[in-house]
Amino acid sequence: MSEFRIHHDVNELLSLLRVHGGDGAEVYIDLLQKNRTPYVTTTVSAHSAKVKIAEFSRTPEDFLKKYDELKSKNTRNLDPLVYLLSKLTEDKETLQYLQQNAKERAELAAAAVGSSTTSVNVPAAASKISMQELEELRKQLGSVATGSTLQQSLELKRKMLRDKQNKKNSDQHLPIFPAWVYERPALIGDFLIGAGISTDTALPIGTLPLASQESAVVEDLLYVLVGVDGRYVTAQPLAGRQSRTFLVDPNLDLSIRELVNRILPVAASYSTVTRFIEEKSSFEYGQVNHALAAAMRTLVKEHLILVSQLEQLHRQGLLSLQKLWFYIQPAMRTMDILASLATSVDKGECLGGSTLSLLHDRSFSYTGDSQAQELCLYLTKAASAPYFEVLEKWIYRGIIHDPYSEFMVEEHELRKERIQEDYNDKYWDQRYTIVQQQIPSFLQKMADKILSTGKYLNVVRECGHDVTCPVAKEIIYTLKERAYVEQIEKAFNYASKVLLDFLMEEKELVAHLRSIKRYFLMDQGDFFVHFMDLAEEELRKPVEDITPPRLEALLELALRMSTANTDPFKDDLKIDLMPHDLITQLLRVLAIETKQEKAMAHADPTELTLSGLEAFSFDYIVKWPLSLIINRKALTRYQMLFRHMFYCKHVERQLCSVWISNKTAKQHSLPSAQWFAGAFTLRQRMLNFVQNIQYYMMFEVMEPTWHILEKNLKSASNIDDVLGYHTGFLDTCLKDCMLTNPELLKVFSKLMSVCVMFTNCMQKFTQSMKLDGELGGQTLEHGTLPGLPAGAEDRARKELARKHLAEHADAAQLVSGFEATINKFDKNFSAHLLDLLARLSIYSTSDCEHGMASVTSRLDFNGFYTERLERLSAERSQKAAPQVPVLRGPPAPAPRVAVTAQ
């Protein structure tokens, strides 16, 4: 069962049980996946489970009747379901909850029905049926009750099957037999009700001597055994799909009549088999049923030969009723088995693989009866031949030719070009899918390998390469499943090697992955230095003001100026401006259900003003068949990692620019230098935090994980392993970079917000102080403005002073509040950082995330923050105020990282 199917089933179950809140569906899904074991059905376990439920049930007869009905239809997974239900009967608490839930649902349904009936007020006269409608209804019921009901039902069933298969294969419609094939009953070979073998009036058999009675009855039986009514033994009309019954002349001698009744089941079985052969020979029932009907027709011919030989003996006067009973014994067993199989296939409405499953299970059930098992093996081998032809084409060439929709693998029309556009990629997962009902029971264990084998070869064929398996060998049905396993294993190994070599060598998968790592995971720093120097001014603009072609040109220039110029795949790198910032995107992916995130999720993207720095990301052009591995899901993960690291790099550059601009502080007086000392310390702490986080992500998460990925790719044996290794690499990077934990993500975003706002504040204050210094220096050094007359000089000085005062009227207030502002930034940053360290410590111990412990040790290398945590903990215990969280600082103004353009 696929992961998406488990998600769907668990959510539907929670909805039916009306479970809200609690641990959520993810907990139960993980529990189910971790405790999933194959159920091995045995006769003893199935019988004991059935008995246990029957004893528990209030109506055991109804339960056993329903079980037998489903069993006769060859229902899949019936025994595992019964076993699960028997286990539920042992859990009293679960039973009590289910009973209460069923009672509440019944009450709600009754209330809904009551409200609907009361809300609709229909006059009493309107509920009466008019005479005309009553007459039409009587005519319809009369037509249903006619003898052609069975024929009409068969015709309706054929039409349904034909429409279903034509819908699946819209380009190739099923052929149709002409109408006269079904309208002429004499062509069927079964009894013609109401038509005798002769127009002569039969003599009353009771008036004949015993020898004459026996001779007449033998002649009648020879007719009846080939589907023709006799004079004294006649077939009764069929009632639905029940077995054929016969009417024997009551005047017949008692001993003879008893022997006749023993022989008549052969004629009844012959009638059942003949009708089955004619019905299943229609195109709508598929090639497997065609082959089964053909094999049965061969056995029926042998039966007719036997009857002809008996007729020859009868004409020679050598066939008595006792001899007929003796000679018919082998045929009785054969026809009984054929009729039983025909009835089971009809009841189960079996097609394709389900027919083969029924035949295979029946062959095993006759293990103690060699002749019956040999007969079933003959039928199964004949019926499986067309199925195995489709299977051989699939596992040896990657081609599906299944005009009757009987094969276990179903093809869906999907375009491979969509694989690099659609986030929910369906090509690899849903282009070819398993149809559980069409898997023969003897191939159940190999179903996944059969699916993968054909998919691998099909991918190579889609690329224009013709593939033919060199170890191809005809597959023939046998009870020894090892024969199938060996052939499928050989085909699977060949297909895996062909596709893997094709992707690795011809399509250079590893080289493409290294190229993506170079850009998305910042493998080479010189390219990003060039690009951010060139594009930073453009990226500070709002998204709607950015010109994408200009960014593309700057990217191209940065690529050509750096060592990335040697990358053969550099032209596949593109610019992508996302509609949401990283935090919003991640919270949507993680499905966080807080009010704020819900509001953000339903907000129009244009309502959230984004800068280019928040929206910027790379994209990568991936062509088929590499898009099977580097699909849209994988690229989205790469983009999340890139945006996370790109923003960290931007914050680092901002802090470094503050460090550069802080050189002007040396020119100020001692009080100003004291004010700046606290800002310098805070800036260094922020820079230390950002740089250590970047070092952790790049050198302690991504590099080791990348080396593991490269090692695994070298040892991969098939494309599914490659997919698993690549997805595991991305998931590990996302997890260890704190992008899958909502709590850590929120705290980290607040820290980034504080850092960005601090840099904006410092740059603004530094510019203001620098302007003040320049104005003062000009006045002191020059005294007068050169090149101007005295009057003009005074006017210019006054105008400049007025403008300066207008722009910096609050300079004194800004200077006086600078120390308080820095203290507030320090308090916020420390509170959020302590919160992050505390959470990291908890996750590293409780969730065994040992990698996060290294972040804690790096950020708190000298115990500075540990001491603060202990001090805050002591203060909290002294104040005894549990309602005030210690590790939380003042709330940030917005949950997402905001950048103020300079």
Swiss-Prot record:
Molecular functions (GO terms): gamma-tubulin binding; microtubule minus-end binding
* Residues modified as Phosphotyrosine: Y83
The ranges of region (Disordered) come to 875-902
A single Gene Ontology CC term: cytoplasm
Kindly report the protein's main subcellular placement as a broad class: cytoplasm
Outline what the protein does: Component of the gamma-tubulin ring complex (gTuRC) which mediates microtubule nucleation. The gTuRC regulates the minus-end nucleation of alpha-beta tubulin heterodimers that grow into microtubule protafilaments, a critical step in centrosome duplication and spindle formation. Plays a role in neuronal migration.
Instruction: Outline the subunit composition.
Output: Component of the gamma-tubulin ring complex (gTuRC) consisting of TUBGCP2, TUBGCP3, TUBGCP4, TUBGCP5 and TUBGCP6 and gamma-tubulin TUBG1 or TUBG2. TUBGCP2, TUBGCP3, TUBGCP4, TUBGCP5 and TUBGCP6 assemble in a 5:5:2:1:1 stoichiometry; each is associated with a gamma-tubulin, thereby arranging 14 gamma-tubulins in a helical manner. Gamma-tubulin at the first position is blocked by TUBGCP3 at the last position, allowing 13 protafilaments to grow into a microtubule.
Q: What is this protein's record name?
A: Gamma-tubulin complex component 2
What organism, scientifically named, is this protein from?
Pongo abelii (Sumatran orangutan)
